[in-house]
């Protein structure tokens, strides 16, 4: 194979088609660096605009709004979160003794969806009217087509849809990896802090992303199809804020928890002591911080007129949720006390992250007060607060991780003097940029200019100088990275920090075998043999196709057509690879501790897929719940609704629902025949299930045609908007199920579903029964209420 390609082409193929978790981690890393360069440039433009009062003017109001909106989206969603994902992809399998992540192709698919989604988002800068300018939170109705008619908002929405898909796949993948792929001896008690924090992060993503996925879908529907979810007063701002902040507040912890994990690893190594009260810390994060982050999101909505009693409840919960954060800082301090502290670059950034996290946290406690929030919400005090958390704590913590793990990544040491200079300049200029914001209590955070008479000029000038210095100081980090990845300088010993972390026992030059030696935690020293994970083009092809589809919806049919062809080709190729067993997933001859999922001696690959299927369905349930919540919210705020039977053909819909229910019965008969080894009968029932599922879609399509004939369209108020969104989603799920069922039926016809091997059919039945259940719930909720 190597002789068939030139070295350059072979290198390109390797990085486009890799499914190895280490290489995927590096792709995440360098892509996040590319995005932070864009976000940092936008920050520089914003600070330059605010350096002096009017008439100083280098950006128009529109250009400034674009810079602010895209800066926030890029930094939070395309830089900080993916940088944490880079560490998780690379090091979690190493830390738990796994060969790779649970689903290597989906891991690659998740990365390429992230990259393509990010490209779609920033492509608005090249579109007529510019990029999105409704703020990084995309508040409706400002983000609607009425107030933001340019394509920028649509491109952001479409790119976000790809990103939400990426995050969902990534969260399922990493959770399954940690739950079921730990090596023998790697018990929960021995799990490294970074892996614990990764698990908590992915659980947050699994259950928070579906809400904003549904909200973004409704927003795109408003902008492209003419629905009115966020233009009608029954939905509008409050509906969007609920859907956004149910994701947005947990996202804060999604950003900071990987940084905390890296900080904990650094503290252990450079103090020579284990984490103080590690068990209590992990319990507090898992049982307080993670669940409470969903219950306090509405503290971002204190000024929206929500019930006063509800505000007090949220205020109290917010203060309770500070306890794990305080405990984390105390545990890190206690870890350092009495330790043999080595002030290397990783430790300096870790300590800086903890210090600024305290400042950011205390400033945030003020905002949790209903009374103070009314005074501070729209000011630069809030900007200072969240930058101390997102830049100070999260970015500094992740930079500590970079300096700690860089020798592992590259096999090279770096200049400690340059790294320390990077720390000193970053810490000084960071505080110079953001600390003065705490004094700008009267400056609105969404203005692009101001008058000299306000007295804000000196503060803004200092902040701008600090921002320039902070941006320039990051070139020191870039220099260190480029030198290390180019293998310039001194080679690193296998374990330069003398760490006890399991990730340091593997070969840094190996992209296949994580553990060439015996894994130390295994009770009897055994470890399963390694399997080469081949290159696979399907994740890249499908992601590129989806990206072109998104761009084509805005820029023209040619891109749309090319995207559809590429996407269909990629999906077909993925199924063909599976039918011909062309891709091998990493397996395990022995599983480690399996609690809370009982193994029962089941085939490991089947067991792994089963856990992943249940996790995906849990996320999909949250998605459907968010859509149902949207319907309930609208109905509660819009009592004037068409009478039952006045618009919809109830008998037809009831019959169609029964058709889909019947398909579940035929599928169960197919499973029973598969268990008994009756291949011909099984294929017959699978075909019947296909026919019934297809009939459901045809009847649903007829219902849409009938409604359009009555002039009941997407824009027919909230009744039309909710009808087409909910029936469209159920139809999309059925269509996806039929694609999977076609693949399974083909396997059955080929004789690859047998009495001993029918796990794929049984796992598919979980999804199909879930879809049927959702349609059964949809029928009374949409048609009979």
Label each region the model flagged.
Residues 530-545, 552-562, 566-785:
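Hydrophobic alpha-helical segments at protein termini of multi-pass membrane proteins
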Residues 32, 112, 179, 186-244, ...:
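Gly/Pro-rich turn-and-neighbor structural signature
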Residues 20-32, 102-117, 187-209, 275-290, ...:
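Interfacial and helix-entry/exit segments of alpha-helical transmembrane bundles
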Residues 38-47, 75-94, 113-136, 160-181, ...:
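Transmembrane-helix bundle segments that line or gate the permeation/cavity pathway
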Residues 21, 71, 97, 116, ...:
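Divalent metal-coordination and catalytic microenvironments
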Residues 1-22, 50-59, 136-145, 184-188, ...:
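Extramembrane terminal tails and long inter-domain/linker segments of multi-pass membrane proteins
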Residues 44-72, 100, 129-157, 216-248, ...:
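Membrane-interface interhelical loops and short amphipathic "cap" helices
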Residues 20-34, 60-84, 102-109, 116, ...:
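Membrane-entry segments of alpha-helical transmembrane domains in multi-pass membrane proteins
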């Amino acid at each position: 194979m190597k002789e068939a390609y030139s070295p350059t082409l072979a290198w390109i193929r390797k990085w486009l088609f890799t499914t190895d978790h280490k290489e995927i981690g590096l792709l995440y890393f360098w892509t996040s660096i590319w995005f932070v360069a864009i976000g940092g440039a936008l920050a520089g433009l914003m600070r330059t605009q605010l350096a002096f009062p009017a008439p100083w003017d280098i950006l128009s109001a529109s250009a400034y709004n674009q810079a602010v909106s895209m800066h926030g989206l890029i930094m939070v969603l395309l830089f900080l979160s993916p940088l944490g994902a880079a560490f998780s992809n690379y090091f979690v399998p190493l830390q738990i003794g796994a060969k790779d992540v649970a689903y290597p192709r989906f891991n690659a698919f998740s990365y390429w969806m992230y990259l393509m989604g990010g490209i779609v988002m920033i492509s608005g800068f090249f579109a007529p009217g510019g990029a999105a300018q409704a703020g990084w939170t995309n508040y409706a109705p400002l983000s609607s087509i009425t107030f933001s008619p340019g394509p920028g908002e649509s491109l952001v929405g479409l790119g976000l849809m790809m990103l939400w898909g990426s995050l969902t796949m990534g969260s399922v993948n990493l959770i399954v990896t940690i739950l079921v792929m730990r090596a023998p001896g790697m018990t929960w008690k021995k799990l490294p802090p970074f892996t614990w924090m990764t698990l908590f992060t992915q659980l947050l993503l699994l259950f928070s992303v579906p809400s904003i996925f549904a909200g973004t879908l409704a927003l795109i529907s408003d902008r492209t199809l003419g629905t009115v979810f966020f233009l009608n007063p029954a939905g509008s701002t409050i509906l969007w804020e609920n859907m956004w902040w149910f994701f947005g507040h947990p996202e804060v912890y999604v950003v900071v928890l990987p940084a905390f994990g890296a900080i904990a690893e650094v503290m252990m190594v450079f103090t020579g002591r284990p984490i103080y009260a590690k068990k209590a810390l992990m319990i507090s994060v898992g049982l307080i911080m993670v669940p409470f982050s969903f219950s306090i999101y509405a503290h971002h909505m204190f000024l929206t007129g929500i019930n006063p009693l509800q505000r007090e409840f949220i205020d109290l919960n917010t203060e309770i949720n500070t306890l794990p954060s305080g405990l984390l800082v105390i545990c890190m301090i206690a870890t350092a006390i009495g330790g043999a502290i080595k002030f290397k670059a990783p430790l300096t950034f870790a300590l800086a992250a903890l210090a600024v996290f305290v400042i950011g946290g205390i400033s945030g406690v003020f905002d949790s007060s209903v009374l103070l929030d009314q005074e501070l919400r729209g000011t630069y005090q809030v900007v200072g607060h969240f930058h101390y958390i997102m830049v100070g704590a999260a970015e500094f913590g992740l930079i500590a991780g970079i300096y700690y793990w860089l020798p592992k990544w590259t096999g090279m040491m770096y200049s400690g003097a340059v790294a320390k200079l990077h720390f000193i300049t970053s810490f000084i200029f960071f505080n110079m940029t953001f600390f003065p914001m705490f004094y700008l209590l009267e400056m609105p955070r969404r203005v692009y200019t101001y008058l000299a008479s306000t007295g804000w000029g000196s503060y803004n000038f200092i902040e701008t100088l600090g921002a320039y210095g902070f941006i320039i100081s990051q070139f020191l980090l870039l220099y260190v990275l480029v030198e290390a990845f180019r293998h310039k300088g001194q080679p690193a010993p296998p374990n330069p920090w003398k760490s006890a972390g399991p990730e340091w026992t593997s070969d840094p030059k190996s992209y296949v075998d994580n553990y060439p030696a015996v894994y130390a935690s295994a009770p009897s020293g055994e470890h399963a043999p390694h399997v080469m994970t081949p290159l696979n083009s399907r994740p890249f092809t499908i992601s590129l196709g989806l990206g072109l589809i998104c761009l084509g919806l805005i820029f023209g049919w040619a891109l749309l057509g090319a995207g559809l062809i590429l996407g269909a080709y990629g999906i077909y190729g993925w199924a063909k690879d599976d039918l011909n067993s062309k891709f091998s997933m990493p397996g395990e001859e022995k599983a480690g501790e399996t609690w809370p999922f009982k193994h029962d001696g089941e085939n490991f690959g089947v067991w792994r897929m089963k856990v992943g299927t249940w996790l995906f369905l849990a996320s999909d349930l949250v998605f459907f719940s968010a859509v149902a919540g949207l319907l309930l919210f609208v109905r509660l705020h819009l009592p004037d609704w068409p009478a039952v039977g006045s618009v919809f053909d109830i008998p037809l819909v009831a019959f169609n629902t029964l058709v889909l229910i019947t398909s579940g019965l035929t599928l169960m008969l197919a499973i029973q025949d598969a268990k008994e080894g009756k291949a011909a009968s099984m294929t017959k029932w699978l075909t019947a299930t296909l026919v019934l599922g297809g009939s459901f879609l045809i009847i649903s399509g007829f219902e849409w045609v009938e409604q359009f004939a009555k002039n009941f369209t997407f824009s027919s108020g909230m009744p039309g908007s909710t009808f087409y969104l909910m029936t469209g989603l159920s139809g999309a799920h059925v269509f996806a199920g039929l694609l999977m069922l076609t693949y399974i039926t083909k396997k059955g016809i080929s004789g690859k579903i047998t009495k001993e091997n029918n796990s794929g059919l049984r796992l598919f039945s979980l999804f199909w029964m879930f879809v049927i259940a959702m349609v059964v719930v949809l029928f009374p909720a949409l048609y009979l209420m």
